[in-house]
Curated annotation (Swiss-Prot):
Protein name, UniProt field: Fimbria adhesin EcpD
Subunit organization: Forms polymers. Interacts with EcpA.
Cleavable signal peptide: 1-23
Misc: Not expressed under classical laboratory conditions, but is functional when constitutively expressed.
Source organism per UniProt: Escherichia coli (strain K12)
Keywords recorded for this protein, A-Z: Fimbrium, Signal
Gene (UniProt): ecpD
Length: 547
């Protein structure tokens, strides 16, 4: 009996390891991936980030953290079709209805991944997000993403904002190494209860070390600079108020206006790259069809120019290393076609943008960014504009509430242009408001919305007789008449011989900080801390009996 028992135990001991091997995922540890370089784009104009390969694509670290105007929505040309993601370099396919985990060891940041990346227009992917949500995430990765049927899916993990923020602060030339774990299984486990792919009875688990070096940092600077451009019926531009770097210019046989539209800094570790292309593109398809390639041109130095024609002309990464600005030239015919198409009172940020294409990464190499400066383009016949006297789109102020505290003052320049002076000019202030005791007040709120504090506000300007006229204007969305302001008149003559005039005046919007009512909330409670508000100032002009 003792012998039989011993034999039974030996057989058991031999069989047990074999049984355990058959009841586990197949783990493959790949050799370390070759180190790769990336270019990081810090977009302060649009408040987002973009990362793109500086050389070879795989292992992948590529794409933006936000959608741009190039996002594919189901029709038209396919440009941006997913947000940013990583992989281990093998671009391994996933099986439909299997579950997938991806997690990082030695991750440079906590919570680096949000889920399974997919191409947004492929069947089974989310067109809005390009993301298949997992059952759960943690500080290392995500778990339990079900691979949907339809288009192909791969072992790609979508990058979190925290990952982009880490890359933003990395010095150029520095590197990080991480271990990417990617595991898929047909077992229907519950990741939200703690189960993981690597612990299941079957599946495939891949492990690989990858290293990425920050080879360059391109910082797009939002200068907030603003300028007005008035155009006549023949497209001839006239510069109005503003501080954008613009000048009239002739290039070849074309006359028009050139402006510095993008300001940037580019730091590199010596990276050489010609696959990254940057060029402008007109957003309005009718205008893009109406103008010729040389009616809009762009330059890195303001003297050597390239025409705008889809992807045909561009500046490479290597060319951008020797500059810090991008200039754009608009011919008179460009403006004339705008007039013909009825495109007026438009902001250049709505008219065109710059595109970024990395031909190395076709699925995630497309990106779009706005200009650093803004032009407000208006017709010279019968138009009105208002801009901050600081020539910025979003002037802001801050201060303290209490006796003797200074008001928050905002200065503006109002311009009308027409064959004659406007017969009527009106102005109003809009924003959060509340009527207290029969008077309208602008309402400032705390971040949590619990404290709402009333502030009086006024509009004032100098009249023709030299007096100051002041209106109570508590963000109440009501028009006030400023026709009798002191206007500075500049005559103009159109190319056709017609004459007209441009009239300018200034107006001040003021929010007193020393009014006793602002010491308490609209509910008559005391308050402490910070409150804020934003609003808009609108103007309109009327011309009557114009032939």
């Amino acid at each position: 009996m003792r012998v039989n028992l011993l034999i039974t135990m030996i057989i058991f001991a031999l069989i047990w390891p074999v049984t355990a091997l058959r009841a586990a995922v197949s783990k493959t540890t790949w050799a370390d991936a070759p180190a790769r370089e990336f270019v990081f784009v810090e977009n302060n104009s649009d408040d987002n980030f973009f990362v793109t390969p500086g050389g070879a694509l795989d292992p992948r670290l590529t794409g933006a953290n936000r959608w741009t105007g190039l996002k594919y929505t189901g029709s038209g040309t396919i440009y941006q079709q997913s947000l940013g993601y990583i992989d281990n370099g093998y671009n391994t396919g996933l099986y439909t209805n299997w579950k997938f985990d991806m997690w990082l060891e030695n991750s440079p940041v906590s919570s680096p991944l949000t889920g399974l990346r997919c191409i947004n227009w492929y069947a089974g992917c989310n067109m809005t997000t390009s993301l298949i949500l997992p059952q759960t995430t943690d500080a290392s990765g995500f778990y339990g993403a079900t691979v949907t049927s339809g288009g192909a899916k791969w072992m790609h993990g979508m990058l979190s904002d925290a990952f982009y923020q880490y890359m933003q602060q990395m010095p150029v030339g520095s590197s990080f190494t991480m271990t990417i774990n990617a595991c898929q299984t047909s077992v229907n486990y519950d990741a939200s209860s703690g189960a993981r792919c690597k612990d299941q009875a079957s599946g495939n688990w891949y492990v690989r070390n990858v290293t990425h070096t920050k080879a360059a940092n391109l910082r797009l600077i939002n200068t907030h600079s603003l300028a007005e451009v008035f155009i006549n019926s023949d497209g001839v531009p006239t510069l109005g108020e503003g501080n954008a770097d613009c000048r009239t210019q002739t290039i070849g046989s074309r006359s028009g206006l050139s402006c510095k539209m993008v300001n940037y800094t580019l730091q590199t570790n010596g990276l050489s790259n010609t696959s990254i292309h940057i060029f402008p593109a007109i957003a309005n398809s009718s205008l893009a069809s109406a103008v010729g390639a040389y009616d809009m041109q762009f330059s890195l130095n303001g003297s050597s120019w390239k025409p705008v024609s889809n992807t045909a002309y561009y500046y490479t990464f290597n060319e951008m290393k020797s500059a810090d600005s991008i200039y754009v030239f608009f011919s008179s015919n460009f403006f004339k076609q705008m007039v013909n198409l009825g495109i007026s009172d438009i902001n250049t940020k709505d008219l065109f943008n710059f595109r970024f294409q990395n031909t190395t990464s076709p699925e995630s190499g497309w990106y779009e960014f706005s200009t650093s400066n803004t032009l407000i383009i208006k017709p010279r016949d019968f138009s009105i504009s208002i801009i901050s006297d600081e020539y910025t789109q979003t002037p802001s102020r801050e201060g303290y509430v209490g006796s003797g505290e200074s008001a928050l003052d905002f200065g503006y320049i109002v311009t009308t242009s027409g064959k004659t002076a406007a017969d009527e000019v009106l102005i109003k202030v809009t924003g959060p408001a509340q009527v207290i005791g029969g008077r309208s007040y602008c309402v400032f709120s705390s971040d949590d919305g619990k404290a709402k504090v009333p502030f009086p506000a006024t509009l004032s300007f100098i009249t023709r007789n030299g007096a100051t006229k002041t209106y109570d204007a508590g963000c109440d969305d009501s028009w006030r008449d400023m026709t009798d302001a002191l206007w500075l008149t500049t005559p103009w003559t159109d190319i056709s011989g017609e004459v007209g005039q441009m009239d300018k005046t200034t107006v001040k919007f003021s929010i007193p900080m020393d009014n006793a009512i602002s010491l308490r909330t609209v509910d008559d409670n005391g308050w402490f801390g910070e409150v804020s508000a934003s609003g808009e100032i609108h103007v309109q002009a009327t011309w009557r009996n114009i032939n």
